[in-house]
């Protein structure tokens, strides 16, 4: 669980592989080794939660498992809220504004 909280890029893969934990086969074990190889190659990346920081991130998520028993595809929605001072610091840290920055700022103005 700690891995999926601090590494959102692994959440789907770990969730999908956990479905086969009781009866894993060779294909699933090879996928586990690939995930572990990825984790080993990306050490130092991820989210860091400091106990002394005054940054308060608020996030809300909702998911609903679809009825397909084969793919188990789900519908997921989320909303993340960040303080305004954090947006100012983020804006200053980006040297060359690009399309991605404009889209992010426009999306954040909707909040």
From Swiss-Prot:
Q: Where in the cell is it found?
A: Mitochondrion
Gene Ontology cellular-component terms listed: mitochondrion
Q: What keywords tag this UniProt record?
A: Mitochondrion
Q: What is its main location?
A: mitochondrion
UniProt miscellaneous comment: A stretch of 270 kb of the mitochondrial genome is duplicated within the centromere of chromosome 2 resulting in the duplication of the gene. The expression of the duplicated gene (At2g07729) is not demonstrated.
Q: What is this protein called?
A: Uncharacterized mitochondrial protein AtMg00240
- List the source organism: Arabidopsis thaliana
């Amino acid at each position: 669980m700690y891995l999926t909280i601090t590494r959102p890029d692994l959440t789907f893969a770990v969730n999908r592989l956990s479905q086969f934990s009781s009866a894993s086969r060779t294909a699933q074990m090879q996928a586990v080794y690939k995930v572990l190889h990825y984790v080993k190659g990306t050490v130092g990346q991820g989210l860091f939660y400091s106990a002394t920081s005054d940054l308060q991130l608020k996030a809300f998520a909702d998911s609903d498992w679809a009825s397909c028993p084969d793919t188990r595809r789900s519908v997921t929605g989320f909303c993340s809220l960040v303080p305004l001072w954090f947006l100012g610091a983020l804006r200053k840290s980006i040297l060359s504004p690009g399309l991605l920055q404009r889209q992010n700022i426009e999306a954040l103005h909707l909040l």
